[in-house]
Regions:
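Substrate-recognition "cap/lid" segment bordering the active-site pocket of phosphatases
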Residues: 67-119
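Short coil/turn segments at beta-strand junctions that form active-site/ligand-binding loops
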Residues: 14-17, 57-60, 118-121, 139
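Structural beta-sheet core signal
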Residues: 63-65, 123
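Hydrophobic "anchor" residues
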Residues: 25-26
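Non-catalytic pre-domain segments flanking phosphatase-related domains
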Residues: 1-20
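Acidic, Mg2+-coordinating phosphoryl-transfer loop and its flanking beta/alpha structural elements
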Residues: 112, 117-151
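A short acidic (Asp/Glu
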Residues: 29-33, 73-76, 132-136
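Short, acidic loop-to-helix structural element flanking the phosphoryl-transfer center
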Residues: 33-63, 70-74
Length: 151
């Protein structure tokens, strides 16, 4: 409820686009485990919190996720279709490092820098390096650690 009320207030008078990371935010992230994304455990509490935001005026939910290989884009989309279908297909940015050989923080920074919008942008991520990189380069973006989703 805390995060819902926070976003409700932020979006009260301004269109707000929320970019949500997948690994570690809405799906479990196990370091060192195989990249079998379709079988990742959904983090239901976070998914439920985010699904409630879809009903808020001025709020649009997007996915911003990185994967290592091109075939994982389809796996992540299938996972979203199964566990979080409220993330519309045309609002999913899943970037493969196979085609873009850069760090996750650079890929997310480049993506967010490429947005040409006057809307308020929020990023929810679990990776402190990514959050710090965005904070240092894109001051206007509002950042939340994934733990903020937990009541």
């Amino acid at each position: 409820m805390h995060f819902y009320e926070l976003i409700k207030k932020l979006a009260e008078h301004k269109k707000t686009i929320i970019y949500v990371d997948m690994d570690g935010v809405i799906a479990s992230y196990d370091v060192g485990k195989p990249f079998d994304f379709i079988n990742k455990r959904p983090l239901y509490n976070n998914i439920k919190t985010l699904s409630r935001l879809c009903n808020l005026k001025n709020v649009e939910l997007h996915i911003l996720s990185i994967c290592r290989f091109n075939n994982q884009i389809n796996e992540k989309n299938a996972w979203l279709d199964k566990y979080a279908p409220f993330f519309e297909k045309d609002k999913r940015a899943i970037i493969s490092k196979e085609c873009n050989p850069h760090s996750s923080k650079k890929l997310k920074l480049d993506y967010l820098q490429s947005l040409n919008t006057k809307e308020q942008i929020i990023l929810i991520d679990d990776d402190n390096e990514i959050l710090k990189t965005i904070q240092n380069n894109l001051k206007e973006i509002i950042l939340f650690q994934d733990s903020e989703l937990i009541d």
